[in-house]
Amino acid sequence: MAHNAVYADMGDMVARFGELEVLQIADRNADGEIDADVVAVALADASAEIDAYLGRFKQPFAETPPILRRLACDIARYRLTATSGVLITDEIRNRYKIDVLELLKALSRGEVQLGLDSAGAQVATSDSGVVFANSKNRIFARDAT
């Protein structure tokens, strides 16, 4: 179900990758400025790619799960680098092909959760925003000695 929300913005890209890198991959008219429209299109495309995997989740989300913000930035970075003439490093390629795609597949299969309640609001989770649960064989308890 499409919802047309974008999970990240240019500020998120700069915070994650630095202004210089974003400039290198998103200055299409070579004026020394980040082309905000180029970044916006890349982030919208990245969000649409994410949504293709998240069909089982109720959308739009009340809040953007932090993990989706990171995934959107990684996808946009990969796509912008591929179209900018800048060399795609192994780190950029692996973040997309291994980290992003594998996590999206795991989310779509229900192997990991976004940490949202039934209304789509964020619940307390780990820093990544992804919840891993295992109820078997508890090792530690409050009363353990």
Residue ranges and their predicted role:
Residues 1-68, 126-145:
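Conserved short "hinge" loops at termini or chain/domain junctions
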Residues 67-78:
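Core structural elements
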Residues 78-145:
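Short loop/turn elements at secondary-structure junctions
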